[in-house]
Amino acid sequence: MQTYFLTSDFPNGFPEAFITALKQTIVRQEHFVFAASSFDKAEVNEKYARKIMDMFAAAGFHFQTLTILDDRLPLAQIDQVLEQAGVIWLAGGDTLAQHASFERIGLREKLKKTTAVLIGMSAGAINMGDQIVLARHELDN
């Protein structure tokens, strides 16, 4: 059985209730996968992956490895990385860019096979769905 968390941003770190739920759910802390929202922005992805890892460390989680799923990860390695993951974090950010990248690599189908805890934040939570509705903001082009 898969476990999903759908979240918004955490500007003040993880709240205690979320930490408690994570501690009851996460059993494997070897491998953490951070699925970026903009696969082509390596520097930004590094920054936000580190921020999330720091919040996990502050909550008492210490993963042995971090893999950032973006354009730097060879397609041939994605299945193995997902199979080894204890937690897969789907980042917030550009919802449409993330959706396009997920479609390109077939990520949503791959996630259906994982035993990892899946956490979608903002755009990542939206992109976990099979049917995605994203209303355009009036200021969008």
Regions found by a protein language model. Name each.
Residues 97-141:
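Class I SAM-dependent methyltransferase SAM-binding "motif I" and its flanking Rossmann-like core
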Residues 85-99:
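Short acidic, glycine-rich surface-loop motifs adjacent to enzyme active sites
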Residues 10, 38, 93-95, 123-124:
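Short glycine-rich anion-binding loops that position phosphate/pyrophosphate groups of nucleotides
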Residues 57, 89-90, 117, 121:
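Generic detector of intrinsically disordered, low-complexity, polar/charged segments
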Residues 1-87:
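N-terminal beta1-alpha1 cap of cysteine-dependent amidohydrolase-like domains
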